[in-house]
């Protein structure tokens, strides 16, 4: 590790800290329905969309109606995206002549982008046409991100309201998020990326002749606009197979910094939105502090492991850290930082190959996802994920002091705890069961490139990434097979919707409750004691569930590497 590396990490953290409050202030006004500087521009369009859809901003929904609207909208998006893939060969804006996508891969991709996972069992430049990238994948990047933020806002309303029957309107929340938050920021980011050299064109691929006289096809396309939303919306799916390691997606250190900041920006701002909506900004800062502590710990371990490198390479007299699978324009520090950011959020974009990280370096992204990506998390998804842990933490605190658990004046009772635990436990259910089957199924084992514990880690990482709606991968697993396409697709759907429904149920239950005034015995939830308790619950409840699997995978691999054994 170097001083320069830590300075870059601290600069990133400082920028996120500076952006959290102003972004939170703006987003709070958007979802409150207050006037914003963009209201004269998007206001008429917003009202027109409501008239077309037959809804009104004054019409609110019970949590069940909110959930039904959300599920129907996502089902429609899934079917449209699947159809676009199957009909690709007959559709325009296909200069490379791409054919129809295989049915199993089309199912996997549709599930991937609808759930904000963006797991890719294909190379974008060799499989998807310009039309599919724009009208299919990029559109889902917007609406899946807006869906996640809408759920977070609905859950916050559950804590903020008292004796209410509704938690907002899904159509209104999603429309406002898209028009006032995602779209304006993405327009600005797209222009910045084009200025930095990222392509944005509908022209055909370019054929070039190299210095050796060989022919090479250079893939182009509407890249900048997709990169903007894939990072801001924590989608992560790359236009190119190499994702953010490709120079056309992430050309230099400036674009890399912007992309890292945009991955965390909205997720961090939601903590401030929470504080404003419940009337106590200290509550939001306490949540952000717990996220920040876990994040810094993850960055420190990952950076240390990658900077220390491989002892087997050190024995050869080479001591430069682990640069395998990393871009020289980013180096070890920014590669490790990006890896932790992209897995702390449910982004999944990569600027280095996680499969080439050391055993401990690769374990940190894995743990981030297994914790439910509650360290800032995806736009909306991470925040409603950490609120599930907050419900459990408050319940534990209540048990310790012998009082009925309360949070923000709302009594946390059996229903809320059961729903929170259901949301928390559905992730290991999807991650571990599919992994267990895959490592004993011959057709699934055949896709594993490496033996021993690293091969197991590749499979575990795949299903962990799917259920956590992350989308990053250990590249040694060949996932484009019927087994992996279907089971990973199912895992993505489970990880998304089996968390959403309990979260909305908690929102509806809390919104209907009366607010209880704080008393001398009320456990304070805006101080360092609560931050420590929340971190402890996340690590114990979320982390220990996966310890046996981690012991079989990266931990054994690390111990074997120390003793000179590789896989």
UniProtKB/Swiss-Prot annotation:
InterPro entries: KdpA (IPR004623). It is found in: Cell inner membrane. Disulfide bonds: none annotated. It comes from the Bacteria. One of its GO terms (molecular function) is potassium ion binding. Keywords: Cell inner membrane, Cell membrane, Ion transport, Membrane, Potassium, Potassium transport, Transmembrane, Transmembrane helix, Transport. It is a multi-pass membrane protein. NCBIfam families: kdpA. The system is composed of three essential subunits: KdpA, KdpB and KdpC. This is Potassium-transporting ATPase potassium-binding subunit.
């Amino acid at each position: 590790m170097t001083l320069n590396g830590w300075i870059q990490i601290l600069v990133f953290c400082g920028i996120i800290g500076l952006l959290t409050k102003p972004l939170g202030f703006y987003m709070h006004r958007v979802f409150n329905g207050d006037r914003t500087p963009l209201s004269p521009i998007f206001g008429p369009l917003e009202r027109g969309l409501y008239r077309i859809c037959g809804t009104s901003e004054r019409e609110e929904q019970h949590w069940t109606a909110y959930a039904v609207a959300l599920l129907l909208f996502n089902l429609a998006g899934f079917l449209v995206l699947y159809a676009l893939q199957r009909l690709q060969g007959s559709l325009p804006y296909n200069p490379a002549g791409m054919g129809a996508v295989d049915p199993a891969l089309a199912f996997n991709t549709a599930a991937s982008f609808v759930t904000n996972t963006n797991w890719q069992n294909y190379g974008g430049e060799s499989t998807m046409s310009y039309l599919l990238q724009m009208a299919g994948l990029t559109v889902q990047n917007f609406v899946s991100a807006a869906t996640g933020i809408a759920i977070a806002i609905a859950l916050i309303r559950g804590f903020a309201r008292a004796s209410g029957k509704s938690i907002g309107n899904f159509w209104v929340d999603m429309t406002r998020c898209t028009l006032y938050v995602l779209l304006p920021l993405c327009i600005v980011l797209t222009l910045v990326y084009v200025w930095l050299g990222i392509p944005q064109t509908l022209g055909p691929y370019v054929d070039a002749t190299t210095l050796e006289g060989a022919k090479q096809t250079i893939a182009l396309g509407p890249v900048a606009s997709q990169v903007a939303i894939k990072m801001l919306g924590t989608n992560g799916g790359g236009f190119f197979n190499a994702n953010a390691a490709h120079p056309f997606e992430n050309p230099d250190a400036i674009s890399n910094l912007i992309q890292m900041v945009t991955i965390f920006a909205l997720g961090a701002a939601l903590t401030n939105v929470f504080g404003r909506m419940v009337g106590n900004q200290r509550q939001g800062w306490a949540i952000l502090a717990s996220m920040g502590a876990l994040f810094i710990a993850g960055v420190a371990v990952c950076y240390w492991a990658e900077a220390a490198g491989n002892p087997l390479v050190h024995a050869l007299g080479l001591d430069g850290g682990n640069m395998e699978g990393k871009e020289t324009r980013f180096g070890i520090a920014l590669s490790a930082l990006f890896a932790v950011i992209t897995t702390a959020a449910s982004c999944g974009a990569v600027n280095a190959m996680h499969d080439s990280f050391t055993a401990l370096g690769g374990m940190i992204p894995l743990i981030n996802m297994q914790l439910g990506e509650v360290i800032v998390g995806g736009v909306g998804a991470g925040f409603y994920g950490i609120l599930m842990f907050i419900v459990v933490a408050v319940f534990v605190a209540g048990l310790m002091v012998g009082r009925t658990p309360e949070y923000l004046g709302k009594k946390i009772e059996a229903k809320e705890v059961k729903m929170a635990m259901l949301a928390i436990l559905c992730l290991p259910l999807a991650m571990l069961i599919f992994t267990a089957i895959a490592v004993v199924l011959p057709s699934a084992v055949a896709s594993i490139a490496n033996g021993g514990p690293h091969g197991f880690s590749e499979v575990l990482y795949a299903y962990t990434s799917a259920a956590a709606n992350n989308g990053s991968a250990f590249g040694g697993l060949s996932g484009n097979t019927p087994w992996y396409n279907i089971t990973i697709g199912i895992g993505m759907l489970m990880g998304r919707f089996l968390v959403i429904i309990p979260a909305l149920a908690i929102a509806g239950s809390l919104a209907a409750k009366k607010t209880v005034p704080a008393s001398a015995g009320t456990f304070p939830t805006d101080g360092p004691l609560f931050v420590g308790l929340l971190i402890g619950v996340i690590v114990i409840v979320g982390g220990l569930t996966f310890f046996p699997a981690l012991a079989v995978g990266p931990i054994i691999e690390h111990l074997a590497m120390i003793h000179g054994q590789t896989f």
